[in-house]
Amino acid sequence: MIDVNKFESMQIGLASPNKIRSWSYGEVKKPETINYRTLKPEKDGLFDERIFGPTKDWSCACGKYKGIRYRGIVCDRCGVEVTSAKVRRERMGHIELAAPVSHIWYFKGIPSRMGLVLDISPRALEEVIYFAAYIVIDAGDTDLEDKQLLTEAEYREKKAKFGDRFEAKMGAEAVKELLEQVDIDKEVHELKEELKTATGQKRTRAIRRLDILDAFKNSGNKPSWMVMDCIPVIPPDLRPMVQLDGGRFATSDLNDLYRRVINRNNRLKRLLDLNAPRIIVQNEKRMLQEAVDALIDNGRRGRPVVGPGNRPLKSLSHMLKGKQGRLRQNLLGKRVDYSGRSVIDVSPELKFYQCGVPRPMALELFKPFVMHELVKRGLASNIKNAKRKIDREDDDIWDILEDVIKERPVLLNRAPTLHRLGIQAFEPVLVPGKSIRLHPLACEAYNADFDGDQMAIHVPLSDEAVAESRLLMLAAHHILAPKDGKPIVTPSQDIVLGNYWLTQAERGREGEGMIFDSPAEAAIAYANGDIHYHTRIGLAADSMPEKPWPKGYEHGIFVTTYGKLVFNQIFPKDFYYINDPTQENLTHPVDERYFLQPGEDIHEKLDNMKLGQAFKKGFLSDSIAQIYKDYKVQRTSDFLDDLKELGYTVCTTSGLTIGVEDIPTISDKDDIVAEARKKVDVVSKQYRRGLITDEERHDRVISIWNNCKDIVQNEIAQIIHAPRNPITIMADSGARGNISNFTQLAGMRGLMAAPNGGMMEIPVTSNFREGLSVLEMFMSTHGARKGMTDTALKTANSGYLTRRLVDVAQDVIIREEDCGTDRGLTVHAITEGDEMIEPLFDRLVGRYTSKSVYDPETHEVICPADVLMDEDMAHKIVDAGVTEVTIRSVFTCNTQHGVCKKCYGMNLATGDDVEVGEAVGTVAAQSIGEPGTQLTMRNFHNGGVAGAADITQGLPRVQELFEARNPKGRATISEVTGEVTSIEEDPAEHTRQITVKGQTDTRTYDVPYTASVAVAEGDHVVRGDKLTLGSIDPKELIRVRDALTTEKYILSEIQKAYRMQGVEIADKHVEVMARQMLQKVRILDPGETDILPGELMDIGEFKARNREVIISGGIPATAQSVILGITKAALETNSFLSAASFQETTRVLTDASIRGKNDPLLGLKENVIIGKIIPAGTGMPVYREMEPKVDVPEDEKKKSVYSIADIEKKLAAADAEKDNGSAD
């Protein structure tokens, strides 16, 4: 067996006839498959055992030799080799064709490869191959020309005139002869000479021919191999034939296609033996050609061959293509054993790293382990008995199952898996019932809820898989989201509600102003009913000596509520006491204003103090981030469980309920609506008098009703902050609902969307508390349906975008420590007008500085070069008033086929330096694709405001940028640097003319009247600046400026599209994508290299080729940067396996085989396809070739790995400590 993991690379090429015969184990001569009575394969047929191997293991066809002891013997009676039946999946046969046949891929593809080699048009070629015309092969001394086409009549005439002085043939034989005559070296030399002078169409054609001929020359493929003398027959088990219940047979379409070829081939052989008339033979040859075409690619030419029920048959090409093809269905996505799926359910009592697995499911998944253990413990005599015991569900198997699943994590996955957190590892816990139990905090990452969602469960089997699951994939490690480094495990709903209610303060609650010596004392008072969670009390600071307090107040008394005191007890002992929901309080001790001054009366202080704020959802998230930063994974995981526990408990005991009476009402809604109606009447009157157009009337009506709704909303916003209303508590805490929901409940629903995407002019003035009228209800249904359809479309679009992104960046891996580049990217805050899109702080965190950062006032170094900026450093830089910083960036990284650690910076999912081997391309694609569903589908309009151009936003804008398409609402940009000398109107042409005068030349741009001009006379513009408002076309920008400017533009535009929707994505992910789009250059002048003009080439390869030429003293090639959309970039990759499995499979493979392409197996996909371990993470050669260290001291070993059992011990110790603490 070949060991795939030793492969360096994989090459594809054209198969010569001899190669095909060497693969074959015998010729298939008859179209028979299996005998319908005996069900045995027919001799010389498509399933012949002599050719393809025995159907039963270690047994010949006639039964003379049975058993493994005869392996390798060929039976003398039936001629079948005794071997394993598995060989029927790998042994090929062949069919010797009676006439040569052209391969449809090379004749029909665009451009036609045969046509280019022979310099014949594809139309002419088709006529020859399908016997409609003769082609002159050798003109001899006649007035005919080589490769001239002759009709049947012309051929006869010339034959009569010249006799045998010329030769002309038809069919694939003629093409084959012509291909054999091609002198590649001569043709290449001639074409190179021609290129020196040729221009226009001639030049393009010459370049394309030269490209193909060069490919044949360099790859060692012969052009004549594009015409086949024999065709391979694929192994029978790959085109099976099985008997169904009713005695009928189900067979693969390929068998039908092969049978047609064999039938026609045999008929042709017979006709040739009989010396049949030429016209009959030609017809049979044409039919054979069509049969082979159908076998290779049915439907590519003419009407497809159909089977029963007029269904086109699936040919060899269809077996590879598309989602159901070999590449995507079987090689990139396999079904796996040891897996199950079930409905999910919530289980709040689980720890963060646990999940509940139903007993019967766990038993089935861990069956082999349980069987092994039963035999080991002597509870079953052998494996068979152990299996029987499990099937009977004996009582003694359950204890063993408990033991077996300890220390064996399982993987849980929820589809759609939009980012890497869609698969996480958990420690299984056996639960009754049939549903998988999930921890409530793990829902956010999976985007799961419990309304019937299902999840799949997988068991990692090998020791390496178990170790990786535990150390890399355990849910407790996945606290930060890779897209922005913010916590993804955010408490929601009840947990938020409980903690918010717990930390509220009230005036005049029982026991207000009591002062306690210690938390334990306060707990007793609460148990006795003397105080409430909301009671404001005094507490001695020295009862918590580990906590940092303000200087001089270490022994003071401070004001807090009992609820906040309880909340603080889940934090680490030495963490600050949290009294205010502010970032300040998470990083500094309690504010001094909460402390009693000597001699101050607590009641008086409480009367004069504002009530403290309760802790909302956002603050809980901030505190998780802070604890993760200070205490790392282990402690954060415990904190999350305590937070969950506290939230649920308090929420339950608080007794919060909601009823219809809790929805507030506003008294003057009717007046506001009446006022709006009056304004609408005025507008209608103006329209009837012809003062305004219908469009203006519509826009004004819409804006009147929108204003009306805003007024109502503002009134509600004021009522809503009633501190004791359960509905407002729910909204204010961030548990559920927002102001817009309340406007609809208590105010008015407002305008509804019309099916055509606009707005209906008639508003819904009622709210849900009053109830809607029938008409209003009907109007609402349009919008509701549109919402549903939009969501469905958006999901599909967003999923496809993710797939293209993953494909273009799948080979971007962290390859080295430092690429040593001296270039960097200067970043500043991204703004749109006065609106801040992305602040500088967000762009600095987690990046390396490229140059030192100086304080703009004192000129001291704040941050030296080559330092990874964390949040503290970034705050320091921003607070000093620095507006731009030069950082290391993926754009300027010099690493080939990937990025280096320094240019990438921090791994946002861990908050540490990124490691060599991290698959940052895939992470970037997931980070951009996963929030795609949150973007809107529509191209926003500006509510009818005149002047501003309609620009695309949301998902269409993101696609437009990544595909480098011409944007809608394209801006005109300046090609020169200089000043705007004049802006003139040309009424006749309906255009404006903007003139820009540069240093050397002056340019005038015609822009339509409708475009808004972005410059004024006298303005200074730099080339690449916008002259009109709109979106810049990146292809134009790269032509006028350079690749870096274009990359920066794409980055800021993508950020705008996402941040407008409130989605945060780190710059580095977009940088990885943009860099992949600009990896190629187009050759302008090849100099003295052997590159072709107009060729697309990888920047790295281009530099390497030029380096060689310069060293040998030649003239280097020149090229210009080009931008490719992600689809094009993914297809232009160096790996033909990756490209073929992405899109246009046949085109990619045709091209790759002619060029004899070599796939270096650098990316992830190509390695998955051939089954090699992927070159990311521990699969990197760097790590695979490591030797284990010898003589590691025992205590060192213990330090490096901790198991779940260790965690359990720590937890138990912590619990015991807690119990002692409360007992004190």
UniProtKB/Swiss-Prot annotation:
This protein's UniProt keywords: DNA-directed RNA polymerase, Magnesium, Metal-binding, Nucleotidyltransferase, Transcription, Transferase, Zinc
Top-level taxonomic group: Bacteria
Residues annotated to bind Mg(2+): 449, 451, 453
Alphabetized Pfam families for the sequence: RNA_pol_Rpb1_1 (PF04997), RNA_pol_Rpb1_2 (PF00623), RNA_pol_Rpb1_3 (PF04983), RNA_pol_Rpb1_4 (PF05000), RNA_pol_Rpb1_5 (PF04998)
Reactions it catalyzes: RNA(n) + a ribonucleoside 5'-triphosphate = RNA(n+1) + diphosphate
Binding site for Zn(2+) 2: 819, 893, 900, 903
HAMAP family given in the database record: RNApol_bact_RpoC
Name of the featured protein: DNA-directed RNA polymerase subunit beta'
Organism: Lactobacillus johnsonii (strain CNCM I-12250 / La1 / NCC 533)
